[in-house]
């Protein structure tokens, strides 16, 4: 089933998939270096960041994880370690560098996960002889988000940080918006897959950039009692 996916995509999608893998691995290796991990530890962090989301997606779709059939993805994650070693200061220092690589990764992985889910589930439905073979839009968007963010969740857990997806930043919501744009273009009659893909990726990137620049985010959930307790404590101090 995984082979049918690779056969159905164009060379451009394949190139973007490798770009996303490399960018995701860079974002993971960069954080591992800041935590003073050794080479092996840095590689593991880069590996789970770049391939963790796609692995969970494929397991949920009941197909072989993509990197087990295409060893070049594993090599790509190793090249990210080498790149950080060669150009360490440029890749390790600065939040902008991390933002660019991380956002490229989640943008590309979101749409790849969405499209692969559609291809695989509809292929499985046809093979089973089902009358209804269309993949539900919310399933595809959800699987795209899992593909995009789950590797980062594993990365943050491994480096003992609160996963970024659970903090204030627009992360999973930006991916969801990109997936909805993909479907909106499809429903509006945009047949060109390249247009849908590129527009959705750029849309996710733009949302993340605006969120960082203007400090946009999801409100933090806290109980009413906590606010009251903090307010009383402040009054006692004053």
What does each model-found stretch correspond to?
Residues 1-12, 125-131:
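Short, strongly hydrophobic alpha-helical membrane anchors
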Residues 219-238:
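Short, highly charged, low-complexity non-transmembrane loops/tails of multi-pass membrane proteins
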